[in-house]
Amino acid sequence: MLQAKLSSRLPLNALLRIHHGAYAPCVHSLSNRFFNTEGGRTRGGLHSDCSVLRRVIYSQSAFRPSLCKTQHYGTRSFSLSSAAVVNSAPAPVRPYLRLMRLDKPIGTWLLYLPCTWSIALASDPGCLPHLGLLSLFGTGALLMRGAGCTINDMWDKDFDKKVVRTAARPIASGEISRMQALVFLGGQLSLALGILLCLNYYSIALGAASLSLVFTYPLMKRITYWPQFVLGLTFNWGALLGWAAVKGSCDWSVCLPLYFSGVMWTLIYDTIYAHQDKEDDVKVGVKSTALRFQEQTKPWLSGFAVAMMSGLVAAGVNAEQTLPYYAVLCTVGIHLTHQIYTLEISRPEDCWKKFVSNRNLGLLLFLGIVAGNLWKERRDTLLQNEEMFR
């Protein structure tokens, strides 16, 4: 009887989604629909039928992981995670959001953080970083990371089909054609250009110069075992651009060491990332530092970490940074040491965990730069007071 009622009042695809556990909100909406559309029945009878329905649905073990917890008065909890935002978007839009990796924001963070370091270093002593510039660069990082992923997937369509982790990407799976991706790429680059035009002329020219790296990086994995180095040159361009946006030009004594540190950082985290796919990369002919270093990965990463820390010290000295900055650098060094020492390159899940932990490292360094910059005002005040009493 219950089955007949359901089948007569619900679309077939909705019932199939319930059976396979792919449509979490159906528990709430299905019972409400059943309750509200059943005419001429007593409230108690409806309640008992709905209870049976819930017991049937909840008994499906495959469905349990997808359930949304409900609170009193019918209010459901919801998630604001990037993956949840993508999954809740209209179906025609979802492939494009996945193409720009909106469901995996770690890449946007890793592109954005060097920009924040540079903006914070360029701020006046005792001042917080310019919030407007941080917002502009954050939006630009989101768009350019999406554009980079679109270019990468257009180049790598045939490779992605052969790798388990990437076979479901929108272009490789056929959800989006290359022409559709090209149009979408044009839209992203147009919006990013609008962001760039908000900056000064020096920054506009500097930003435009990075486009060659954006387009050529995806090709590097075909011709060299060092594509991560080219990615580092691309991803850390914001270390130059951020300073220029604040000051109107680059102070190379600060910007170059900072940029160098960012490149070393990218070599660390993207080599770790590449170890997830090394077996598939060998099969399809893709090159990476993970394949170049193999069992010598940890010594190489240790060398990159030392180089990164040296560059950060040089940038701090040339930018006249203060005690809080160097205290945080010690913490950054500890983070890198732990990350490399505990890395298990044969376990993809550990590689992913170490890779995403670099967002926290980058945020920590940003906070250290901000704290060091605020401390400059205190230091300058103390120096002025000493001169007054001499």
Feature names for model-found ranges:
Residues 88-94, 314-390:
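Extended hydrophobic alpha-helices typical of membrane-associated regions
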